[in-house]
Amino acid sequence: MAKKSSVEKQKRRERLVQLKWDKRKELREKSYNINLSEEEREQARIALNKMPRDSSPIRLRNRCQMTGRARGFMRKFKLSRLTFRELASMGMIPGVTKSSW
């Protein structure tokens, strides 16, 4: 199990990213728009830099939904490799079987 504080911090970041997504997208588009004046583009970059760091999606980390483990994450199932192995061996994940040849 991951520390509860790490999992809560991740949830807080996810909420902040979702909340600021539109504003961040708008500022990013302004800063890359070559039809605007250089001053307007610079203002957009400054405003983007003043936004909270945690509102950037880069700071998000994939975590296992059951344990909160950040490493060994399997995107398709949203589980860590350890949890995935446990559940798969118990037959709790539909369509997943142990291979043999």
UniProtKB/Swiss-Prot annotation:
Top-level taxon of origin: Bacteria
Record has Ribosomal protein as a keyword: yes
Gene Ontology BP annotations: translation
UniProt GO MF annotations: rRNA binding; structural constituent of ribosome
GO CC terms, sorted: cytoplasm; small ribosomal subunit
Keywords: Ribonucleoprotein, Ribosomal protein, RNA-binding, rRNA-binding
Subunit structure and binding partners: Part of the 30S ribosomal subunit. Contacts proteins S3 and S10.
Biological function: Binds 16S rRNA, required for the assembly of 30S particles and may also be responsible for determining the conformation of the 16S rRNA at the A site.
Name by which UniProt lists this protein: Small ribosomal subunit protein uS14
